[in-house]
């Protein structure tokens, strides 16, 4: 009976022992590792590859098992593959203790390596041992097995800082950016990291301490081709007058003002960065350098036209007085009305002068003179009335310009009949009361009428020139008169 009771109690003890024993499986890893479903083990996370700006202050990031180090860029790294002392897996699983002295990320730490990375406390995760000596670093690369987290729902786990236990009893990252537990400023952007977060500045800003300050892009050329204007968080380029931004918003290209908005009144010439206006012939630029004003050529010079200058838009023209016509655009030429149209009668002859014409009788002879040839009147010897008068009167006509320069030879008188043993003398008989003329004998049979005072037209001046012929032996004496009509034109041309 006692034997039966003992067996029964032994069986119950065994059953009770089996019920209270907890079966633990491992599917999660400690911080710095992740589960590899293929190898069915935890593998190291390369924080230097996934953590932005893992190291500060110009330090370089060196990944190791379960964490990373920030070392000076001049540091010499010596890898020691010796296996570090490790606790048994049972001890590792139960306590989480490790022999390594370095842990990574933002776990509870007792010290910080400058530039980033952490030195773990005694409760840190297992990892490689780092030995330092001035600027030499020895890293044991053989890792201890990472701590695995039991997946039993009834087991309460302790997660590292930045992690929390999920409903599946695994340590999952806390997204501080979405949960609002970050301490980023309003002008910063929160970026979640595995087990932590970082605060980045908005584009166009850079961190200075804990604050974000504007980046002055204009102080670091060459952002812009010509002008640069810095704005909060950005900048923009601007061009000098006469230029505009190209499609790349950086380069400045010339504005062709002559094609776009031609402001010139007449001619436009584009130049680099500007334009100039020019005017057609006969115009000049106004004070605004855009419009054109007519040039009054007639006011600039009094020698453009022989008679009268008439200003016109962009040009000028010359006019001549009545009786003249314009030749070669500027000079005036007399119109010979006697060859074209005149109002003289049939018994009159037309005499043209500078600027007009006159009609004179074809027979100018007065009694007792008779017409013997053109403009020559002779007094017959048989007529008793001809004894004390000149034997002949010749009518001549000439025209001169007004204000002719003096002295000037204007007319020559010459004997048509030459007698032997005679002496010819010449004198001005009439028409020289004001002394405008002088008669100079040039030969025994001729003389020259000289104008010694200027005559201003229009006027008609009649001068009587007499040639007296006397026989050297005193046998006879005779005289002839030349009645010269001088027509002075109204102008000096």
Swiss-Prot record:
Signal sequence interval, chain numbering: 1-17
Annotated region described as Mediates interaction with TIMP3, given as residue ranges: 259-493
SUPFAM superfamilies linked: EGF/Laminin, Growth factor receptor domain
Sorted UniProt keywords: Calcium, Disulfide bond, EGF-like domain, Extracellular matrix, Glycoprotein, Growth factor, Repeat, Secreted, Signal
Subunit text: Interacts with ECM1. Interacts with TIMP3.
Major localization listed first in the record, in broad terms: secreted
Cellular component GO terms, alphabetical: basement membrane; extracellular matrix; extracellular space
The gene coding this protein: Efemp1
EGF-like domain boundaries: 26-71, 173-213, 214-253, 254-293, 294-333, 334-378
Pfam families (alphabetical): cEGF, EGF_CA, Fibulin_C
Expression (tissue specificity): Expressed by olfactory ensheathing cells (at protein level). Detected in lung, intestine and kidney.
InterPro entries (alphabetical): cEGF, EGF-like_Ca-bd_dom, EGF-like_dom, EGF-type_Asp/Asn_hydroxyl_site, EGF_Ca-bd_CS, Fibulin_C, Growth_fac_rcpt_cys_sf, Nephronectin_domain
Cysteine-cysteine disulfides: 177-190, 184-199, 201-212, 218-228, 224-237, 239-252, 258-268, 264-277, 279-292, 298-309, 305-318, 320-332, 338-350, 344-359, 365-377
Disulfide bond as UniProt keyword: yes
GO biological process terms held by the UniProt record: camera-type eye development; embryonic eye morphogenesis; epidermal growth factor receptor signaling pathway; negative regulation of chondrocyte differentiation; negative regulation of neuron projection development; peptidyl-tyrosine phosphorylation; positive regulation of cell population proliferation; positive regulation of cell projection organization
UniProt family annotation: Belongs to the fibulin family.
The protein's name: EGF-containing fibulin-like extracellular matrix protein 1
Residues with glycosylation annotation: 249
CDD domains the UniProt entry points to: EGF_CA
Organism, scientific name: Rattus norvegicus (Rat)
Phylogenetic placement of the source organism: Eukaryota, Metazoa, Chordata, Craniata, Vertebrata
Task performed by this protein: Binds EGFR, the EGF receptor, inducing EGFR autophosphorylation and the activation of downstream signaling pathways. May play a role in cell adhesion and migration. May function as a negative regulator of chondrocyte differentiation. In the olfactory epithelium, it may regulate glial cell migration, differentiation and the ability of glial cells to support neuronal neurite outgrowth.
Localisation: Secreted, Extracellular space; Secreted, Extracellular space, Extracellular matrix
PANTHER family per the UniProt record, alphabetical: PA14 DOMAIN-CONTAINING PROTEIN, UROMODULIN-LIKE
MF terms in GO: calcium ion binding; epidermal growth factor receptor activity; epidermal growth factor receptor binding; growth factor activity
């Amino acid at each position: 009976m006692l034997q039966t009771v003992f067996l029964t109690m032994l069986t119950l003890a065994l059953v009770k022992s089996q019920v209270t024993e907890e079966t633990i499986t491992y599917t999660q890893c400690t911080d710095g590792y992740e589960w590899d479903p293929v190898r069915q083990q935890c593998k190291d996370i390369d924080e230097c590859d996934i953590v932005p700006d893992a190291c500060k202050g110009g330090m370089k990031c060196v990944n190791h098992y379960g964490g990373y180090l920030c070392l000076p860029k001049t540091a010499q790294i010596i890898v020691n593959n010796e296996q570090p002392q490790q606790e048994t897996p049972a001890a590792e699983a139960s306590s989480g203790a490790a022999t390594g002295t370095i842990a990574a990320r933002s776990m509870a730490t007792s010290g910080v390596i400058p530039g980033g990375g952490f030195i773990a406390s005694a409760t840190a995760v297992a990892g490689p041992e780092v030995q330092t000596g001035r600027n030499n670093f020895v890293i044991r690369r053989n890792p201890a097995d990472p701590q695995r987290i039991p997946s039993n729902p009834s087991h309460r786990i302790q997660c590292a800082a930045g992690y929390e236990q999920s409903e599946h009893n695994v340590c999952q990252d806390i997204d501080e950016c979405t949960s609002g537990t970050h301490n980023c400023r309003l002008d910063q952007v929160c970026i979640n990291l595995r087990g932590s977060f970082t605060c980045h500045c908005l584009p166009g800003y850079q961190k200075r301490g804990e604050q974000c300050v504007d980046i002055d892009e204009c102080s670091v050329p060459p952002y812009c081709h010509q002008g640069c204007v810095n704005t909060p968080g950005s900048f923009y380029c601007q061009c000098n007058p006469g230029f505009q931004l190209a499609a790349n918003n950086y380069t400045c290209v010339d504005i062709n003002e002559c094609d776009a908005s031609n402001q010139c009144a007449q001619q436009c010439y584009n130049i680099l960065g500007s334009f100039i206006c020019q005017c057609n012939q006969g115009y000049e630029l106004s004070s605004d350098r855009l419009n054109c004003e007519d040039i009054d050529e007639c006011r600039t010079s009094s020698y453009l036209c022989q008679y009268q200058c008439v200003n016109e838009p962009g040009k000028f023209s010359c006019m001549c007085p009545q009786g003249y016509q314009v030749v070669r655009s500027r000079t005036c030429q007399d119109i010979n009305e006697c060859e074209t149209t005149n109002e003289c009668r049939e018994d009159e002859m037309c005499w043209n002068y500078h600027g007009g014409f006159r009609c004179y009788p074809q027979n100018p002879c007065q009694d007792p003179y008779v017409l013997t040839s053109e403009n020559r009147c002779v007094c017959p010897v048989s007529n008793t009335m001809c004894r004390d008068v000149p034997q002949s009167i010749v009518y001549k006509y000439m025209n001169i310009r007004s204000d002719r320069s003096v002295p000037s030879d204007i007319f020559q008188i010459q004997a048509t009949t030459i007698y032997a043993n005679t002496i010819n003398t010449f004198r001005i008989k009439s028409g020289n009361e004001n002394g405008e003329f002088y008669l100079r004998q040039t030969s025994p049979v001729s003389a020259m009428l000289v104008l010694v005072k200027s005559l201003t037209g229009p006027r008609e001046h009649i001068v009587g020139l007499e040639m007296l012929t006397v026989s050297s032996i005193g046998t006879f004496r005779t005289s002839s008169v030349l009645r010269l009509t001088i027509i002075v034109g109204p102008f000096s041309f």
